[in-house]
Regions:
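Conserved acetyl-CoA binding element of GNAT-fold acetyltransferases
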Residues: 75-87, 222-232
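Conserved GNAT acetyl-CoA-binding A-motif
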Residues: 106-118, 247-258
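Amide-forming acyltransferase catalytic core, primarily the GNAT-like/NAT-type
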Residues: 134-241, 245, 257-261, 274, ...
Length: 358
């Protein structure tokens, strides 16, 4: 695809390192250690779309692959990251072109939805994205919980990865409809990622048997727990565990923790924006204990194949959908919906567990 004298294309994997200079320019706050990790271990697995002018990369968009649970099924989806445009090429529609190209390919693969963590939601709303997950946050002062009942803590090593993967899957599937599959490969990479951010993955345990985990970074000597998962019923022993592990820290910031640990100072903020990619595949992937019937029309400028009027039914066994013929539209008068509205209606925020660690 070409725009003026610029070309839009997906890079061959051997070319991915060509985007590093733009990455370092657009994301100057990322440490050298993290950028090294990203290009050594992550970028090779990504799909990278770029706008080129001759040999110069003007803009880029990365698709990070994840296996994602959705109502009992597992789907290969993509997390949109590292969207950036060189300063002199901004406000020329390059990001829209990259989104359109990447969404088209995801549509061809029948991916139900995609997601991203926006720097500014206003950038993505015009393209069918809407907030569909949130994250809680509170500050913990470790010394206030010294002497409280506490889970054991120990630094996760590669030998702990199989147990972590099994425990995380067991805990998350009981509560959430949507979450990234916690495989051994997922945790192996997470160990490296946290090391690149001067942090760790910490196992929460009872008599050395894993009962959960926490993920934290400590860049600039500021501790931030980015995700905390623990077996139901053991939440009250988490604060004591934090007091032991972070004994010398005056305070720590905690994100993405169980609701039972929320207090009057807890803040909840929108986190991830999602977008339906293949509308029919999305509806067919859903399940609902209470049957849901829908009759609606959608206009999708980015993926015109989704545009139309539909009738859908979602049951405990899955979803069924069909596109209405013109004569049916006049009779049934389908409700006009935005893509983001439909996504939010069918996947409530509390059913989704997608954090920065994904």
């Amino acid at each position: 695809m070409a725009v003026d004298n610029k070309r839009i294309r997906k890079l061959d994997r051997r070319e991915h390192d060509r985007t590093r200079e733009l990455y370092e320019t657009v994301f100057p706050k990322d440490s050298q250690l993290f950028v090294d990790y990203y290009y050594d271990q992550v970028a090779d697995e990504n799909e990278i779309y770029v706008v080129e002018k001759e040999e110069e990369i003007c803009a880029m968009l990365h698709l990070n692959p994840y296996e994602v649970h959705l109502d009992g099924g597992v789907y290969p989806l993509h997390y949109i990251v590292a969207v950036g445009t060189r300063q002199e090429y901004r406000h020329q529609g390059m990001m829209k072109s990259l989104l359109k190209a990447s969404l088209h390919e995801m549509y061809e693969r029948k991916e139900p939805f995609t997601f991203l963590m926006p720097a500014d939601e206003a950038i993505y709303r015009p393209f069918g994205f809407g907030y569909f997950s949130e994250q809680n946050f509170r500050t913990v002062v470790p010394k206030e919980y010294r002497g409280c009942p506490a889970l054991e803590c120990f630094r996760a090593e590669m030998a702990d990865v199989p147990d972590l993967a099994w425990e995380a899957e067991r805990i998350l599937k009981e509560k959430y409809r949507v979450y990234a599959r916690r495989t051994e490969g997922y945790f192996a990479r997470l160990l490296d990622e946290q090391e690149a951010q001067r942090g760790e993955v910490v196992v929460l345990a009872k008599e050395r048997a894993p009962k959960g985990y926490l993920v934290y970074s400590a860049e600039d000597a500021r501790v931030e727990i980015r995700e905390l998962v623990v077996e139901p019923g053991l939440e009250e022993e988490v604060l004591g565990a934090l007091s032991d592990w972070f004994f010398y820290d005056e305070q720590i910031k905690v994100y993405g923790f169980p609701e039972k640990l929320e207090n009057e100072d807890t803040v909840k903020k929108p986190l991830m924006m999602g977008r339906i990619v293949h509308l029919e595949a999305f509806l067919e992937s859903l399940k609902s204990e209470i049957p849901i019937k829908l009759c609606f029309s959608i206009t999708d400028e980015m993926i015109p194949e989704n545009t139309g009027s539909y009738e859908a039914e979602i049951t405990p066994f899955g979803g069924k959908v069909r596109q209405l013929e013109e004569k049916e539209v006049q009779k049934k008068k389908p409700e006009k919906l935005e893509l983001a509205e439909l996504l939010g209606r069918l996947l409530p925020k509390e059913s989704i567990f997608l954090h920065e660690t994904v």
